[in-house]
Amino acid sequence: MNRQNISGTSPYEAIIGFSRAVRIGNVVHVSGTGPVGADDLSASEQTRHVLTLIESALHQAGANLEHVVRTRMFIAKAEDWEEIGRAHGEVFGGIRPAATMVIAQMLNPKWRVEIEADAVLPDAG
């Protein structure tokens, strides 16, 4: 089975040794994606920025947001849950992937959210 590594623009990829996304067959795993370059934005704006980065990685892997079956949201502060959740819902409200929200410390203290996503493309046959 072919493996396709997708690189993004995060400076952390080379340091930590990871890909923005990896496609194996018809499955795409998008790494935890933080709001790189959007540090000073609100929680909802950071979430929208992160989802744009995820969408770009999916497109590079031949997928799109409609193929997402699971997201994991890591949030820095419990009080941001609704703002982040609503921004997530703006994108995924009609798709409704399985989702989890966890409170976690961020790599960058200005980040309020980091999101992972898994997508499954339809079988070719």
Model-found features: residue ranges?
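N-terminal presequence-like segments and the immediate start of the first folded domain
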Residues: 1-69, 75-125
